Amino acid sequence: MIVNGIGALNLKPGLGDTATDLIQGGVAPATSGNLGTSFAEAVSQAASKTVNTLQNAEQVSLQALKGDADTRQVVDAVMSAQQALQTAVAIRDKVVSAYLEVSRMGI
């Protein structure tokens, strides 16, 4: 599965742009007392949100097996988890690509 760009991940309209939600939603706005979050914190928060989305999909799937959730809830949760995972993979691929590009640079 190759993802050409984060913007291409609009799998389900109405759920919001997961890539934007993961990145922008986890970063606090800079204020005079707060210089903003570091890149590591932003990535950590995005990863945590991705894990939470995947765990939610798993919980909804288990609820459906018990008869406590309908099919629509399962589909929404699984599609959201798929979109979050694809976004995480795309970000990982870009980070690895950037690292390899920097490592090939001449000094």
From Swiss-Prot:
Top-level taxon of the source organism: Bacteria
Name a GO CC annotation attached to this entry. Answer: bacterial-type flagellum basal body
Q: Which gene encodes it?
A: fliE
Q: Which terms does the UniProt entry file under GO BP? A: bacterial-type flagellum-dependent cell motility
**What family does the database annotate?**
Belongs to the FliE family.
User: Translocase: is it a keyword of this entry?
Assistant: no
Name one matching Pfam family.
FliE
Alphabetically sorted, this entry's keywords are: Bacterial flagellum
Annotated protein name in UniProt: Flagellar hook-basal body complex protein FliE
Q: Where in the cell is it found?
A: Bacterial flagellum basal body
GO molecular function terms noted in the UniProt entry: cytoskeletal motor activity; structural molecule activity
